[in-house]
Amino acid sequence: MKTGLQLLLSLIVAPLTMMATEVKSPNGNVVLNFTVEDGRPTYTLDYKGKAVVLPSHLGLELAKDKHASMGMEERSLLEGFTLAKEETSEFDETWQPVWGETRDIRNHYNEYAATLSQEWQSAPPKGTRGQRLAFRRHERHIIIRFRVYDDGIGFRYEFPQQTELNYFLIQEEKSEFAMAGDHTAWWLPGDYDTQEQETQ
């Protein structure tokens, strides 16, 4: 009976974990879809009904043996996640810059914050003869926060205060952008000592 109930719950819960959360821009043209697929944070982006970004993963690779979370085994923030919490909100303000070509700038977006949980168990340390030691359970949380504007999106990673992710170094950001076409990309050079570089 217990096995049958567990199977039924699995069949109910599994499709829910695969369902994507849809967030639209204020005018509805930009559509973000976010889900956790096989433990990996994944998003897509559409504009006016056409795909712009195909399914792309998000995550961070941590530098090995560099963070000081006590008793923490090395594990990057790439996979093994479940969706723990979702929050959506709308923000709309108009502000005036001190200098620039535009007098009023409107900051209007819909926001979506996904709190992700990463859980695992580590092997117990070796005890004295006859001593039984239990596996240690670990849990970490990160937040991926999206802002969906009428002309695009932005996102960032946030790290709530927690013992399992207390101090760490990020070796590489693994945010993916699987563009749906052969697009032209614009970026700023990585010269962090000056702001005089032109956008390329």
Annotated model-derived regions:
Residues 1-5:
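Positively charged n-region of N-terminal signal peptides that target proteins for export
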Residues 6-15:
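Bacterial N-terminal signal peptides
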Residues 16-22:
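Bacterial Sec-dependent signal peptides at the C-terminal "C-region" and cleavage site
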Residues 22-200:
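N-terminal accessory beta-strand-rich subdomains and adjacent acidic, glycine-rich linkers
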